[in-house]
Amino acid sequence: MSEKCKKDDWVEIHYVVLEARERTGDIPEDTRKVPLECWIKGWAEKEGTVGEEVTIRTPANRYVKGTLTRINPEYTHTFGPCASELSAIGQELRATLKEGK
């Protein structure tokens, strides 16, 4: 993996939204002790190196500045394991709708 990105490369940045001292008192104490952080993906507006501050354009066309953390990051979220109880619903619904025509 390259440590440098070019303009328009898909990248991930990190920035601190709120420092620990700026956080509200209405959250659990252990949460209040750490900063609120954000990792966000988008296209680099100019070339940069991991660890440098860069600006990105997000898929929603927002411009966000932060520290470059990764170049060409993958998506790591999932919808979890398959719920076998739900796997037949699509076919059952199609059959029910077809009967109604």
From Swiss-Prot:
Keywords: Transferase
Enzyme class: transferase
Record-linked InterPro entries: OrtA
Molecular function terms from GO: transferase activity
Gene Ontology BP terms: ornithine metabolic process
EC number(s) stated in the UniProt entry for this protein: 2.3.1.263
Signal peptide interval: none
Superkingdom field: Bacteria
Catalytic activity of the protein: D-alanine + acetyl-CoA = (2R)-2-amino-4-oxopentanoate + CoA
Keyword Membrane found: no
Sections of the chain in a coiled coil: none
Subunit structure: Heterodimer with OrtB.
Sequence similarity: Belongs to the OrtA family.
Family matches, as NCBIfam families: ornith_OrtA
Name of this chain's protein: 2-amino-4-ketopentanoate thiolase alpha subunit
